[in-house]
Amino acid sequence: MAEDTGTNNEGTGCSGWFLVEAVVERTTGQQISDDEDETVEDSGLDMVDFIDDRPITHNSVEAQALLNEQEADAHYAAVQDLKRKYLGSPYVSPLGHVEQSVDCDISPRLDAIKLSRNSKKVKRRLFQSREITDSGYGYSEVEAETQVERNGEPENDCGGGGHGRDKEGEGQVHTEVHTGSQIEEHTGTTRVLELLKCKDVRATLYGKFKDCYGLSFTDLIRPFKSDKTTCGDWVVAAFGIHHSVSEAFEKLMQPLTTYMHIQWLTNAWGMVLLVLIRFKVNKSRCTVARTLATFLNIPEDHMLIEPPKIQSSVAALYWFRTGISNASIVTGETPEWIKRQTIVEHGLADNQFKLTEMVQWAYDNDFCDESEIAFEYAQRGDFDSNARAFLNSNCQAKYVKDCATMCKHYKNAEMKKMSMKQWITYRSKKIEEAGNWKPIVQFLRHQNIEFIPFLSKLKLWLHGTPKKNCIAIVGPPDTGKSCFCMSLIKFLGGTVISYVNSSSHFWLQPLCNAKVALLDDATQSCWVYMDTYMRNLLDGNPMSIDRKHKSLALIKCPPLLVTSNVDITKDDKYKYLYSRVTTLTFPNPFPFDRNGNAVYELSDANWKCFFTRLSASLDIQDSEDEDDGDNSQAFRCVPGTVVRTV
């Protein structure tokens, strides 16, 4: 009987912890290859030639370098193709700062993230600068050579080492790929950037503008010292604009402007813009700079912004001649200051000033004060040829004085020609509001004034009845005496005299050219003066008045209102004035509401309604033959052409 296989005493002693497996050389059913020798042991001799450990020769080194160079070229070309699409992300202007556009403009917070405070050199750049990358929109070879010739040889510290890649292999590829013309182009652009870092950038832009357009920028503009001064027309010269922005600039500015004159030029700095703009609303230099910096994608200090010379014929001729050429884009209506200086007819008309036209304008607009005439007429210089001739004259003060004098003469003659009825109608036509007459009546009742007797006295006063043409309103302070009389005098277009000027011989001179008058706040001395020297005047008789620099004038006193805190009816020394002065007493204070506004409104519109409603009672009603309208022709002091009816 055969012996049992395996081990004896299994599970006893040390053998109890181990399982001994049998070594099997071949499994049942395994196929054996024909070319495999079953008797040969696996010693590893078949893997001897798998690793090539032979010495490296010179030919193999050149092959590896060539392979690395070809792979680096392929990678560099792929990166540049990707950058070509996204080159517009940072500043693409050649005037921009290269490090700023790469490090700061990609992200506003990128510049704050630093590992070292003193490190200024960037080890790796996300974007190459425009000048050293083949973006497809760079300068041509001719422009690059021209720029190098202008800027001269580069300085020692202006090299392009900071723009290369840091890896040794990539640095070699970068040096071999770029040609000599590209290196010169990068050097010229570096000189431009260094030039703009100088102290006076504005002077540099002025010089560059003259090189581009052949004339000085100051020949087209008048400088504004303040950036806050507003103007409607602006001349802007902008440098370093991307070509894609120039195509959309006109459409972007159309909603804001009424006129644009655009000129584009291309030089070594990129696109240069010269534009004359008329905005719909006046803007300051700061506002214009912010607007154009947003549209053009350039910094504000790369622009020259000033208002145009509107009085220069040379500047107007420049805009006119370039506007009709194909070098400019013009939209909107040409400004009037260009038309005025380029059309012969307008130029001849500006040299002729006519005083009669100025007087007619002042008369039609009720301007009799010299300062108002000078200011208002000067503002018409933009659209009135006679006003432009006035501004160009050296005798403006004389013309203003003569105009005011003639206008006063015409107004006084017109006023004296009218009766009181016509004058009230004339003054009422100047007021457009309807108004209400009841507040005036309510105020009189508040002062205990009977309305019917008041109308009778007012009727005699308006018509200048002798010894009835002076009404004195007396009473305590703050009862509304001056307010009531001032509102009435304002509506009737009267004058105001004051006893404070009584030391002068001419303090009664305003009565010569007045339809009605007011003497406000008459004191004891004023009543004494009137009782002594003005009895004939209050009687309604003619009286001679002394006038300054003129002869005495014989006049009849116009209807006169007097306000006073002195009641002359209670003093016997004024007994000679009792029959000459009609006295009304206002005993009650003037009422106000909680907000401090007058309870009874004494406005021009209310006085108009008062005289219109009570015209029959006051005997100032228009007659029936005048109801059909006024057929009289308006006053004209300018010789006009004959009106031909069709």
Curated annotation (Swiss-Prot):
Keyword Hydrolase among record annotations: yes
Quaternary assembly: Can form hexamers. Interacts with E2 protein; this interaction increases E1 DNA binding specificity. Interacts with host DNA polymerase subunit POLA2. Interacts with host single stranded DNA-binding protein RPA1. Interacts with host TOP1; this interaction stimulates the enzymatic activity of TOP1.
Family (UniProt): Belongs to the papillomaviridae E1 protein family.
Residue span of motif Nuclear localization signal: 83-85
Ranges of biased composition (kind: Basic and acidic residues): 163-185
EC number(s) stated in the UniProt entry for this protein: 5.6.2.4
Entry protein name: Replication protein E1
Major localisation: host cell
Localization (cell): Host nucleus
